[in-house]
Each structure stands twice: as C-alpha cells, then as structure tokens.
C-alpha cells in the first residue's frame, strides 16, 4: 500500500520541517510520498519542503479546503492522508491508519493532542470534544485519511467552507463505507491558543459538530491569521 501524505501550508517555515521529518520516520516501513500544497506562502515554506524531498504544489487559494484538494490531485498513493503543517505523526499513528483501511474502513482520523502551554478551558473541554468527534465519526482536522475512491465520490473538500472542511467531508464519507477514529493521537501545535482566546477556539470546534452551521466560513482568520513560532 502506497501512502500519500498531503500537507496544506501557508507560511509554515518554522514547523513544516518537523512535520515532514516525523512523517518520513513514521512511514519508513511503507512506500510513501509527501506532498506540500503551498498556498502562496511568502516565507521559505516551499524551499524547506523541497530540501526535505517533498513534492511541492503551488497554489493561491487562501482557502484550506481547495488547497488540500490541489495536493490530492497529484497524489499517486492508495491512501490519502491529510496532515496539518504543524502536526507530528508517530509510527503508531501510521500503523493504526493502515490497519483501519486493511480492516475495511474507507476513511478515518486521529484526535490531536496539543503541545506546549494550553489554557485551562482547553484542557477541560478537549476530552469532551474528543468523545463528541469519535461518536459523530468526524475528523478533527490535524490528521484525516481516506481512500482516493471515497474522496472522489464524496466530492472532495467543499470549497464553500473556509474551515472545518474535514468535518463536512467526514459526514459525506459515511455514505461510502466505515469511518474509523484511531486510538493513537497526533501531536499538533498549541500556537492558536497563543493568538486566539481559548473560548473562540473551543466554540469553533463545538460549532463544527453541529449540522447545518455555516458561520464557520467567517472564521478564516483562525487558519490564515498571524503565525507565532511556538
């Protein structure tokens, strides 16, 4: 099974290298490719990706769903794995991902752990959100996987949504087979908690679990706002 890791990126020179290296180490037992969809970065994002051997797709969307789609278009693997540019993947995560597909799932995800200093509100609410996402069988964004066939049948990521596009795709993927939330967890940056209030972030995560909520489109700044190193 060939794995295609797709990383949407915008001005991710600080953390992208760590993400790519974690994938390379974690997927070494499999045939794999790493695709970085660079959404008009004005830093060294593309250069770092190329230096580390990743395939770089240049785009100018300012829309994470379309950027993920652009990366998927050039993928040649038997499994599409979408990883955020600030997320570290382990061997256990990759192994459980492959096992999920081998056991009949067509899609799935991993609920992330946040690194660094995280506000108390986030620490309190995150376990509840993890249960909600598992019960609803939707991806939390930092790590999601699906077969190319189910991805196309579901219509790819919906460009109407500037955020939470993975939740809406997850709901559509349910029509085409089993969805599996793996037990292993990726580690993602807690930097958003340092540029946005924990209440804003937690409410965004809660809203995306509610069918029909589209106000999430207005929260583009949460994904394309100022970057902090860590």
Feature roles, as predicted:
Residues 7, 20-21, 31-40, 57:
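Short beta-strand/loop segment that forms part of the nucleotide-sugar
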Residues 38-46, 87:
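A conserved acidic beta->alpha catalytic loop
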Residues 59-75:
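Glycine-rich, basic loop-to-helix element that forms the pyrophosphate-binding segment
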Residues 14-18, 43-52, 92:
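Acidic helix N-cap motif at the loop->helix transition within catalytic regions
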Residues 11-26:
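Short, well-formed alpha-helical segments that are part of the catalytic scaffolds
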Residues 91-120:
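Conserved donor NDP-sugar-binding/catalytic core segment of glycosyltransferases
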Residues 163-169:
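Acidic donor-binding loop at a coil-to-helix junction in glycosyltransferase catalytic cores
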Residues 80:
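Short aromatic/hydrophobic "clamp" motif used to bind/position activated sugar donors
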